[in-house]
Amino acid sequence: IKGLSEGYDTIIGERGVGLSGGQKQRIALARALAVKPGILVMDDTTSAVDMETEKYIQAQLRQLPYDCTKLIIAQRISSVKDADLILILKDGVVTERGTHQELLRQRGYYYETYCLQNGITPDTAPQEVM
């Protein structure tokens, strides 16, 4: 917001300044957090930001100064790896559940996705992945 020509007074929209996908996501998240919700549902909230920005956002979400249950729907493993509980759904059915480490040890869909997103061949993954 500070980088926009008029800061908080900048008009956004069809006749206003265009925002990138990542900027839209960050502003939407900031608006959601401004009301200090008890429950926050985030659907691919960081899909359009770079990895460094995602790390920063995740760190800030962990340090919220109020109680907030966070439900994170994501494609990126990096978005959910620090969650207390991760659920993998297929056709509306939970097929895997656990922490990041537990799901890696199961060597199921989560593990395969982790390997794919991190450039690791599942069959030759080093033991430290587990």
At which residue positions do the language-model features occur?
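Conserved catalytic loops of ABC-family nucleotide-binding domains
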Residues: 63-74, 80
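C-terminal portion of ABC ATPase nucleotide-binding domains
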Residues: 1-7, 59, 67, 81-130
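A short, proline-enriched helix->beta-strand linker immediately N-terminal to the Walker B motif
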Residues: 34-38, 67
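Helix N-cap at the start of a conserved alpha-helix in ABC-type nucleotide-binding domains
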Residues: 51-52
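Catalytic Walker B motif of ABC-type/P-loop ATPase nucleotide-binding domains
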Residues: 40-43
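Short loop immediately C-terminal to the Walker-B catalytic DE motif
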Residues: 46-47
